[in-house]
């Protein structure tokens, strides 16, 4: 072994070597390392505590539904510890994700499993067991033995008073079930089956156990009570304060219940329709539930024959309020078959056969699919036809039909109205810009460029105008790159997403601040210079306010979306895709509806600015002398300077 000598002084070497008297271990020849053996005994406990041979997926069943997935760490077939599993499939960007799964009870399940107090045998009150065995030996019949005990008030009071005082003894499973059966038979034969009441010990119990017990009570004619009918503790506050009905569903389940209820109400009226809808409505509340409840109330008041004929007149005999979604977009053309095929393929992709009795685009069928089979795929189908669904709602509302409330409830699920807004408003803005610009040029050509204020004041203008115009040009170019060029293109060019956003934030912030400073000076000039202020129209004043708001909102979106303040957000995956989809006439309003609020505010202000554009002095942008850059050369002949008796006056 080659030893590297130390380069320190003699005193330093002596001090280093003297350390062997104080530090246990072997010092290397170069005095640079110390090797110790042992001293890690304290780590053994932790290594053994968290060691395991394998990891299995399981759940726990201590007063629980067993719906939470746990990772169970096992060593030598013994549970050592457990952690929550987090690989639940996503429900998609349009729906609330599952609430966190796993509670402290589950985290301590191994304690329950190996607890010395774990119940491993059937137990019964010792006093009652003695009386039952004596009566059965004397009478020879289990039911007669139980009846004999109940007929004697003294013996009955004796075992009842023993409750809560211990005195439990082990009994066999056969004897325990025999005593339970004898008690049920005696109670039913003496008082009737309705004197037998069943309930769950806690709402969060095994669904198999609850189903078996409730089915047994129903088969013998007993009464199945709800958990809140007897459990007078904290959970009762939930239904009293929030209006929840017994067990509370997750937020995502509310949409499923609304879709299921709407599917029931939009089908042909039958005797079970309203009862099923009311049963579903018992589990949800809120505006959507109120709308569905209004439909149920109006149909409940109507005569069955009247409701049936009104349904036929509304949906079967009139195309203006049809429930077949593709008819709204394709009409009676061959394209409708192609669109219906998309519905059928969606159903088959989830291993569900398309309906045979109805076409796959029938709205109740789509709602049923979204509620019970694949919420994400159903959500996409409903979002793709949000405009026809909104038109159907308007048609039913104009006709004052009760089904309008149901369709309105469907529109409220998720952000369908928001999707419709971001689908329609861009085209409304484009129409205003096109028609308004034509009108302005046709009827106000003189005012197109004559409202310039350059003649009134030029000192501030020479400073503010370049700042604003050069800044806004950089902002426009940046918006064009971010909105028009797909993210995949910049990545293919070797520009990573992180590098792109850094450049966008830096350059965009500088350009935005420059633009804001320039427009601030322009507004100050217009307000403080009398002639300039007099030449400013009301529309221009509103335009300046909207313009400043758009710039401020853009700077805010840049800061918030970049992660400088708050969590970073990649707008190129939603806002940019929405922008491009608008121009190819395939608007994805759902993407814009998913964007954060600060992006929505910025885009909304921008659309308002474009809507004001034709009616303000911003139209001078259309008169920019672009042709001046490509003008032909002008040939002229120089002339000798004239000798005058007095200096020439400047022309400006």
Swiss-Prot record:
Q: Where does [4Fe-4S] cluster bind?
A: 60, 64, 68, 103
Which Pfam families does its entry note? Molybdopterin, Nitrate_red_del, Nitrate_red_gam
Q: Where are the transmembrane segments?
A: 416-436, 466-486, 504-524, 545-565, 595-615
Q: How is it used?
A: This protein serves as an immunogenic antigen, inducing gamma-interferon responses in whole-blood cultures from M.tuberculosis-exposed adults in Uganda and South Africa, indicating this might be a good vaccine candidate.
Q: Does the keyword 4Fe-4S apply?
A: yes
**Nitrate reductase alpha subunit: region residues:** 1-251
Q: Where in the cell is it found?
A: Cell membrane
What are the GO BP annotations of this UniProt entry? Answer: chaperone-mediated protein complex assembly; nitrate assimilation; response to hypoxia
* Cofactor note (record): Binds 1 [4Fe-4S] cluster per subunit. Binds 1 molybdenum-bis(molybdopterin guanine dinucleotide) (Mo-bis-MGD) cofactor per subunit.
Q: What induces it?
A: A member of the dormancy regulon. Induced in response to reduced oxygen tension (hypoxia), low levels of nitric oxide (NO) and carbon monoxide (CO). It is hoped that this regulon will give insight into the latent, or dormant phase of infection. Induction by hypoxia is independent of nitrate and nitrate levels.
Q: How does it sit in the membrane?
A: Multi-pass membrane protein
The residues covered by the 4Fe-4S Mo/W bis-MGD-type domain are 53-117
Q: What protein name does the entry list?
A: Nitrate reductase-like protein NarX
- Gene symbol of the encoding locus: narX
